UniProtKB/Swiss-Prot annotation:
Organism whose genome encodes this protein: Prochlorococcus marinus (strain MIT 9303)
Signal peptide positions (record): none
Function: NDH-1 shuttles electrons from an unknown electron donor, via FMN and iron-sulfur (Fe-S) centers, to quinones in the respiratory and/or the photosynthetic chain. The immediate electron acceptor for the enzyme in this species is believed to be plastoquinone. Couples the redox reaction to proton translocation, and thus conserves the redox energy in a proton gradient. Cyanobacterial NDH-1 also plays a role in inorganic carbon-concentration.
Compartment(s) where it occurs, according to its Swiss-Prot or TrEMBL record: Cellular thylakoid membrane
Main location: membrane
Origin superkingdom: Bacteria
Descriptive protein name: NAD(P)H-quinone oxidoreductase subunit L
Keyword Transmembrane helix on entry: yes
Length: 83
């Protein structure tokens, strides 16, 4: 009985659960952090206080995904140029 259960093909419910995990993980680790990087890069100097507070909250919430992309993205602000 146990051998038959182990060797049987994966049920459709298991595949649906696995697909849901992959989808949610991809959203959490890839899609939302990239959108958050883009949004913060465009709006950094013109954010209001509540928008900045929500940005900090989103950074806290999506920190694992942001830290994955941090070594590859260079979003430094232009600054003052040569000093």
């Amino acid at each position: 009985m146990f051998l038959q259960a182990v060797t049987s093909p994966i049920s459709i419910n298991s595949l649906m659960v696995l697909a849901a995990y992959v989808l949610l993980g991809g959203l959490y680790l890839i899609v939302v952090p990239l959108l958050l990087y883009s949004w913060m890069n465009r709006r950094w100097h013109c954010m209001g206080k509540f928008e900045r507070l929500s940005a900090y909250g989103m950074v806290f919430l999506f920190f694992p995904g942001l830290i994955l992309f941090a070594p590859f993205l260079n979003l430094r602000l232009n600054g003052q140029g040569e000093v």
